[in-house]
Structures are given as C-alpha cells and as structure tokens.
C-alpha cells in the first residue's frame, strides 16, 4: 500500500520554551498551550507536533490573542483572550502547563466571561454563555509511525459482555483513519508509555459513545502518521429554560498526562505500563 504524506512541520515562526521536573522535560510553544515533545530518561514521545492557533468556543473557531508567562522551571501560563463579537464571545481564559514528576498537567485555572451571566438568574440570550471549550486538535501526547513499537490502545464503555470495548491499534504508515472517543487511552513505543486523564464529561452518543472524555486522532505529518490523545470538549456555563445553572455545576477544565518506562517489570513497554501509571492521575471516586 502507498505511504501517506501530509504537511511537514514548519517551526520557523515558533518560539519554544522548556518546563521540567527532575525526571520529565516538556518542550512547549510560547504562542499556544501546546507540548511539542516530552523527554523521559533520554527517550522521547511527541505531543502536538504541528502548530495550532485556534480553539473552539461554543463551537465557533476562535484565534485567541495569547500572552505567555513562564512562572518557574516547571510551570508556564497562557492568558488567552477569546473574542468573537458576532457570536457574543467575550471571555478571558488562563491555561497553565505544569510538569510534576513524570506528569504534565494541563489546567484552565480561570475563566472570566465579560458578558452579563449570573448563576441561578435569567439570561436574555443563551449565546452569551461560555458554554463549551474545545482544544480538539491539541494532542496532549502522541506516537509516530517512525517510532519502534508505536501503538494506541483505547477503551470505550461496553455494556455487552460479548463485545470488547477495547481497541488495539498499531501506528503505521499507511494506516486507517482514526477519530474516535474513548473513556481510557494510552500510547506506547518500545521505550515509553503514556496515559491521559481528563475531567471532560463529553458524550458522543449513548452506549460505547458515552463517557468519551478522550478523543484519539490520526494526523499525517510529513512522511509519518501520528496518533494523539486529546481531551474531548469541556462544558462550562449552561442554562435551562433561560435560567443559568448554579455556580456549583461549573468545573474548571483539567487534563493530565503521565509518562512511564516499564512499570510492571515484564521487560517490555506497552499499554499495561501506561495503565499502571494512570492510577497516579485518575480521579478516584470519593471513599476509595
């Protein structure tokens, strides 16, 4: 089969910075909260290798005006001005990227909607709500067909005992297209494995499309295929019959990536290592 090709990376206009812990280093774009690459113990995993400038707010494409600030060795902050007058979007959002041990944390730490929106009160036009934020396209971690043993493993909700909700996909060139929601997602090479957690409450439908807080995408870059794990869309302000939801329903968007070498000492790296490491970033139900 013929090899696939895509747009090559042009980093001539990108300024990168580095944030790191004692074990993990992340190369980040100063113009957008995007990780280009991770390094752990001399081995690398790609993040989002192609430049990004847009996000989706209320399903409208916005090119935010971004101010970058490096807080310290481990942490960087992005102030993103979201403006789209004809669609009533007038908000500021702060995004923090932070490396903690072998994890990267992607956190929206503050959202200010300059429209008049009062929780529990009437709203005259629901378009004034900042209802959804979507960084789709911003792969939090990925693998490339150029890497030995590159694989994506994902799990969806399966209520049918005869049908597995699991996908095990080798990342090759060529390969089938992939754009699918998952509850759990891992990428691995023969050296490193990574898992991603998000507090997105996204659903692409019922059944196995439910609780799809992660989205996996294939992207062809140059001569290589990349499969990356993205957070699905986040919800923020909502209204029902013209009444804005109460404040307590709002949860600031958050995602975490964990990267590991062989974690179960079986002398190979695969999704199981990512799954073991994932326990350190998963959101445990209260009482567990």
Predicted features, each with a name:
Residues 1-9, 15-288:
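Carbohydrate-recognition beta-sandwich/jelly-roll modules
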């Amino acid at each position: 089969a013929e090899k696939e090709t895509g747009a090559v990376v042009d980093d001539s206009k990108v300024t990168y910075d580095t944030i790191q812990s004692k074990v993990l280093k992340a190369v980040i774009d100063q113009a957008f909260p995007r990780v280009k690459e991770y390094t752990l113990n001399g081995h690398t995993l790609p993040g989002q290798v192609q430049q990004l400038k847009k996000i989706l707010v209320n399903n409208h494409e916005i090119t935010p005006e971004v101010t970058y600030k490096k807080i310290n060795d481990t942490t960087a902050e992005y102030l993103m001005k979201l403006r789209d007058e004809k669609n009533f979007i007038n908000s500021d959002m702060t995004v923090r990227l932070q490396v903690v041990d072998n994890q990267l944390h992607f956190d929206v730490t503050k959202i200010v909607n300059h429209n008049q929106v009062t929780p529990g009160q009437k709203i005259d036009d629901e378009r004034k709500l900042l209802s959804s934020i979507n960084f789709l396209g911003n792969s939090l971690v990925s693998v490339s067909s150029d890497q030995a043993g590159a694989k994506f493993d994902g799990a969806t909700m399966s209520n049918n005992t005869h049908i597995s909700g699991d996908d095990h996909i080798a990342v090759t060139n060529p390969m089938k297209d992939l754009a699918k929601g998952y509850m759990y997602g891992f990428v691995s090479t023969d050296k490193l494995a990574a898992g991603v957690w998000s507090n997105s409450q996204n659903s692409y439908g019922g059944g196995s499309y439910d609780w799809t807080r992660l989205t996996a995408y294939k992207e062809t870059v140059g001569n290589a295929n990349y499969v990356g794990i993205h957070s699905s869309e986040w919800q923020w302000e909502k209204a029902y019959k013209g009444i804005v939801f109460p404040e307590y329903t709002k949860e600031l968007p958050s995602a975490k990536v964990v990267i590991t070498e062989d974690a179960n000492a079986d002398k190979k790296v695969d999704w199981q290592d990512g799954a073991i490491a994932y326990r350190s970033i998963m959101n445990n139900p209260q009482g567990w």
